[in-house]
């Protein structure tokens, strides 16, 4: 279903808004697992990231509240999304993404939440997962419309991918590694945004 949904949504967005531009796709690791972290404001950037990385499927981390209704839960599960408790993250948050990465899958995390505390938790989660799984983090920035109205206004959609960020294995000084990597990710986001 993931492939069908990606191709279908790609067609719909093309008809509404024209072709999307993907920059630096050649920087993606080939045949190796990685974590992609992307800026996030609406459902449109999630869809566009999936389209940009296609045919590589992304397993999206999504807030558990979206899985409360059975129908929505079934759809999200078929679209490779898995739930996470953002308000009370614990060791179990690492289990699913680590299992996916071990199977050489790609995990998508959107750290730009509605609250600064949530953004930090999600960024830290991505860093800890990358360290434990020994996989790189690929920063991505979406620039474009965030509403149906803006899509119809033909505002251009662009996904820009950055250089791989390699997180060292966590030692006793986990906090320093996390903070340093957080700064690198934030700086990468800003640099990618400035490319437009």
Task: State what each model feature region is.
Residues 30-88:
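Catalytic core of membrane glycerolipid acyltransferases/transacylases, capturing the structured
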Residues 22, 75-76, 137, 161:
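Structural signal for hydrophobic
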Residues 26, 89, 143:
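Residue-level "edge-of-site" marker
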Residues 1-35, 44-45, 73, 80, ...:
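Membrane-anchoring hydrophobic helices of lipid-metabolizing enzymes
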Residues 9-10, 78-83, 110-114:
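Short, basic, glycine/proline-bearing loop/turn elements
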């Amino acid at each position: 279903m993931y492939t069908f949904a990606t191709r279908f949504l790609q067609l719909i967005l093309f008809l509404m808004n024209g072709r999307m531009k993907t920059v630096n796709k050649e920087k993606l690791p080939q045949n190796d697992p990685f974590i992609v972290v992307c800026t996030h404001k609406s459902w449109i950037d999630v869809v566009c990231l999936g389209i940009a990385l296609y045919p590589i499927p992304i397993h999206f981390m999504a807030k558990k509240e979206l899985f409360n209704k059975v129908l929505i839960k079934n759809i999200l599960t078929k679209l490779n999304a898995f739930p996470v408790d953002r308000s009370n993250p614990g060791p179990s948050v690492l289990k699913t993404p680590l299992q996916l990465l071990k199977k050489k899958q790609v995990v998508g995390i959107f750290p730009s939440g509605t609250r600064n505390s949530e953004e930090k938790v999600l960024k830290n989660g991505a860093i800890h997962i990358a360290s434990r799984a020994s996989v790189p983090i690929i920063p991505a920035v979406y620039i474009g419309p965030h509403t149906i109205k803006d899509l119809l206004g033909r505002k251009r959609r662009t996904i820009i991918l950055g250089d791989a960020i390699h997180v060292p294995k966590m030692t006793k000084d986990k906090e320093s590694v996390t903070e340093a990597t957080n700064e690198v990710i934030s700086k990468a986001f800003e640099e990618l945004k400035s490319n437009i």
